[in-house]
A protein has these predicted regions:
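RecB-family 4Fe-4S metal-dependent nuclease core
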Residues: 1-257
Length: 257
């Protein structure tokens, strides 16, 4: 069934576009016929660390308060169950180690958790930029990531990790549109703060990559608007641990027998 009459009124976001790419039925349950969501370990964990980093940069927590806040609030904030004890322990320890010696590259950023509203063509978009900072006269967009991304390999043929990096960069390229409007210049760099691995991954801004991201966004919106088949993409790990609707997904429930 086509839902273009509903979809035409959407304000878009990067997460809304990727939700459809990951699973059309997840998109359906999230945005067309909204259902309640269940807590998930990975998203709860990422949200909690984002919150602590924001509080540190906004001055609501000082450096020597970070670990105590993390330890006393972890189980209240990270409600979803981890896939296994090893993953829980690994994530917990990596978050703790990051906060013990948090070395954020821009301790006095221009903006933290900066909301932006903008258009691509005639399509309205919204988003939250984790950090906007200046390096001299240059603008930097930084995204805090719980995912352990890898720096670009530099190989002639892109690796799987290079392609994954490019996928995540699309979000920051879209955010560069309102940043250009606000600061009258595009960012000089796009960066990921992969806090679990304590690695900053910088990427120089490229206008051709921006145009590619804009084209991807508009083509994805067109695909969603015309879509009539909302069948799921069934993958055990993603359905069980990454989908916040799997507890009420008929397809997943049938698979459980």
């Amino acid at each position: 069934m086509n839902y273009s009459n509903i979809i035409s009124d959407f304000t878009w976001s990067y997460s809304r576009l990727t939700a459809f790419e990951h699973c059309p039925y997840k998109f359906f349950l999230s945005y067309i016929k909204p259902h309640s969501e269940r807590p998930l370990f990975f998203s709860d964990y990422g949200t909690f660390l984002h919150k602590i980093i924001e509080m540190r940069l906004n001055g609501k927590l000082c450096q020597d308060e970070l670990v105590t806040f993390y330890l006393t609030n972890f189980r209240k904030e990270v409600v979803g169950a981890a896939p296994n004890r090893d993953i829980f322990n690994s994530y917990f320890e990596q978050g703790l180690n990051y906060l013990k010696n948090m070395d954020f590259p821009y301790p006095t950023p221009n903006a933290v958790e900066h909301r932006v509203d903008f258009f691509i063509g005639d399509k309205p978009f919204t988003g939250i930029i984790d950090c906007v900072a200046k390096d001299g006269d240059n603008i930097i967009i930084l995204d805090n990531k719980s995912r352990a991304l890898k720096p670009r390999s530099g190989r002639k043929k892109p690796t799987k990790s290079d392609l994954e990096l490019d996928e995540y960069l699309r979000q920051l390229y879209l955010y560069s549109i309102p940043i250009q409007t606000e600061f009258q210049q595009y960012p000089e760099r796009l960066e990921f703060n992969c806090f679990r691995t304590q690695q900053i991954i910088p990427e120089p801004f490229r206008e051709d990559a921006l145009e590619h991201a804009k084209l991807w966004a508009l083509q994805t919106i067109d695909t969603i608007t015309q879509n009539e088949d909302w069948s799921p993409k069934m993958e055990y790990w993603k359905c069980k641990y990454l989908c916040d609707h799997s507890h009420q997904c008929e397809y997943q429930l049938m698979n459980r027998g």
